[in-house]
């Protein structure tokens, strides 16, 4: 089977990761002790992608849990999910990274990294045919961002031919823990551009807006935000976990979604959006699901897809529905909004349908868009970065950990390059006299950046 090793790192990564295991455990009929209590053979057909079958028909997650302080680990261990994980899958330090990327990447994180790699190797060796890794982390703190990107470098060195995906939570001033978030985020994105094959950008600002506007929650908690993330992660991984034809493994997903190597940052979306613990009272039609899924208000990244153009799109529909109707709805959306999709990539909207709906819903849809408007997210964080770096504010916290100040400049210019690449492909129009030359020029420039 094609196995995936899941790594969650830092406080945010561990909280979201724990929620992910809770949700997919429910979907596959795996209880908190790791025993199967499901009802459908489909639940077990591809169970080995995320679970290892241990002695006595116990299913153990292929997970590595990492943090530089013990707090989050202890709360997972003492939760009802605690006995699900293998005890030596927990790797933690005691000092914390103090929201400092350099501590996570160069000092505290570097001391712990070999222990983490030992667990990663052990998990990889227990696989028949490892397809790749997925890392869950945030970019605003110190551990998830600094140590998370260090771990990606190490995995890239040791497993250069395996796919590496990340679920990365972008920081936002609306849900902010710390003043140096822009530094941590830009330094991390610089690494994500080079080392990941696909990055699912989950944005606290967008999650906050969804809770506020769509779900009408007056004071959203991290629990509410994590609930939305777990719905999306469950949807994105559906075609990896259940039998299906499209995007059935990480490499196929990357091939369908990434037209140019550096442009691998996706905006996820989900429909229907429901608040934690509440049920949907009215069954949605396929047309309403499709409409909601493409709605900017359902997108989990704080940028407006209407201001950009879609290079590629993947849609995962779940529940009992007509595939023909799904195809018709997507075709009509593409026809009505043809200027939102680049015309020089034909057939750039891919659809998968899975019979098994998420728990508590009859039908649901998950959306993955590679849209040039994602540059807004990078522009926002890079402006905050530049405002502080111009005055060298807080830089001593980073240089005192042995980090070179030139890294700040490199990371900043890399993000600027990324933004201009997205802009370039947004501006290319097919059908004009020089359009093919435009595309070729843009491709050549993008390739130059890769080398």
Curated annotation (Swiss-Prot):
Post-translational note: Some glutamate residues at the C-terminus are polyglycylated, resulting in polyglycine chains on the gamma-carboxyl group. Glycylation is mainly limited to tubulin incorporated into axonemes (cilia and flagella) whereas glutamylation is prevalent in neuronal cells, centrioles, axonemes, and the mitotic spindle. Both modifications can coexist on the same protein on adjacent residues, and lowering polyglycylation levels increases polyglutamylation, and reciprocally. Cilia and flagella glycylation is required for their stability and maintenance. Flagella glycylation controls sperm motility. Some glutamate residues at the C-terminus are polyglutamylated, resulting in polyglutamate chains on the gamma-carboxyl group. Polyglutamylation plays a key role in microtubule severing by spastin (SPAST). SPAST preferentially recognizes and acts on microtubules decorated with short polyglutamate tails: severing activity by SPAST increases as the number of glutamates per tubulin rises from one to eight, but decreases beyond this glutamylation threshold. Glutamylation is also involved in cilia motility.
Residues that coordinate or bind Mg(2+): 69
Disulfide cysteine pairs (residue numbers): none
GO cellular component: cytoplasm; intercellular bridge; microtubule; mitotic spindle
Keywords: Cytoplasm, Cytoskeleton, GTP-binding, Isopeptide bond, Magnesium, Metal-binding, Microtubule, Nucleotide-binding, Phosphoprotein
CDD domains, A to Z: beta_tubulin
Keyword Transmembrane: no
Primary localisation category: cytoplasm
Subcellular location: Cytoplasm, Cytoskeleton
Molecular function GO labels: GTP binding; GTPase activity; metal ion binding; structural constituent of cytoskeleton
Positions of modified residues (Phosphoserine): 172, 435
Region (Disordered): 430-451
Record-linked InterPro entries: Beta-tubulin_BS (IPR013838), Beta_tubulin (IPR002453), Tub_FtsZ_C (IPR008280), Tubulin (IPR000217), Tubulin/FtsZ-like_C (IPR037103), Tubulin/FtsZ_2-layer-sand-dom (IPR018316), Tubulin/FtsZ_GTPase_sf (IPR036525), Tubulin_C (IPR023123)
Source organism superkingdom: Eukaryota
Keyword Cell inner membrane: no
Family affiliation: Belongs to the tubulin family.
The protein's role, per its UniProt record: Tubulin is the major constituent of microtubules, a cylinder consisting of laterally associated linear protofilaments composed of alpha- and beta-tubulin heterodimers. Microtubules grow by the addition of GTP-tubulin dimers to the microtubule end, where a stabilizing cap forms. Below the cap, tubulin dimers are in GDP-bound state, owing to GTPase activity of alpha-tubulin.
Protein name: Tubulin beta-1 chain
The species this protein was found in: Mus musculus (Mouse)
Gene this chain is encoded by: Tubb1
């Amino acid at each position: 089977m094609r196995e995936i090793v899941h790594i969650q790192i830092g406080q945010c990564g561990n909280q979201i990761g724990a929620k992910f295991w809770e949700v997919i455990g429910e979907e596959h009929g795996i209880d908190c002790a790791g025993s199967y209590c499901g009802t459908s053979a489909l639940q077990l057909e591809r169970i080995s992608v995320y679970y290892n079958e241990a002695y006595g028909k116990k299913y153990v997650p292929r997970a590595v849990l990492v943090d530089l302080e013990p707090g989050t680990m202890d709360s997972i261990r003492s939760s009802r999910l605690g006995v699900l994980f293998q005890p030596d899958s927990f790797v933690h330090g005691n000092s914390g990274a103090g929201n400092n990327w350099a501590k996570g990447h160069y000092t505290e994180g570097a001391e712990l990294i070999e222990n983490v790699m030992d667990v990663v190797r052990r998990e990889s060796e227990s696989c028949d045919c490892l397809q790749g890794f997925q890392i869950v982390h945030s970019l605003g703190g110190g551990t998830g961002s600094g140590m998370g990107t260090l771990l990606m470098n190490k995995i890239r060195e040791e497993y250069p031919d395996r796919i590496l995906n990340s679920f990365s939570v972008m920081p936002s001033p609306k849900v902010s823990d710390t003043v140096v978030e822009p530094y941590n985020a830009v330094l991390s994105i610089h690494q994500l551009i080079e080392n990941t094959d696909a990055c699912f950008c989950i944005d606290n600002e967008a999650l906050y807006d969804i809770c506020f506007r769509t779900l009408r929650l007056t004071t959203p908690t991290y629990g509410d935000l994590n609930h939305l993330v777990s719905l999306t992660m469950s949807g994105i991984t559906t075609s990896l976990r259940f039998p299906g034809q499209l995007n059935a493994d990480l490499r196929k997903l990357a091939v369908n979604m990434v037209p140019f190597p550096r442009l691998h940052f996706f905006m996820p979306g989900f429909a229907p959006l429901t608040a934690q613990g509440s049920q949907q009272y009215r069954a949605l039609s396929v047309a309403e699901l499709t409409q909601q899924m493409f709605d900017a208000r359902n997108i989990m990244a704080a940028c407006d897809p209407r201001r950009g153009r879609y290079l590629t799109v993947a849609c995962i529909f779940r529940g009992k529905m007509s595939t023909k109707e799904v195809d018709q709805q997507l075709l009509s959306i593409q026809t009505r909004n043809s200027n939102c999709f680049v015309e020089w990539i034909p057939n750039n909207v891919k659809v998968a349908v899975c019979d098994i709906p998420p728990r508590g819903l009859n039908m649901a849809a998950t959306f993955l868009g590679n849209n040039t408007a994602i540059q807004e997210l990078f522009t926002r964080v890079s402006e905050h970065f530049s405002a502080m770096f111009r005055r060298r504010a807080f830089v001593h916290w980073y240089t005192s950990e042995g980090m070179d100040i030139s890294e700040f400049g490199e990371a900043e210019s890399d993000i600027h390059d990324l933004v201009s690449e997205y802009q370039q492909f947004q501006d290319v129009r097919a059908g004009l006299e020089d359009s093919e030359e435009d595309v070729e020029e843009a491709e050549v420039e993008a390739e130059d950046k890769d080398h």
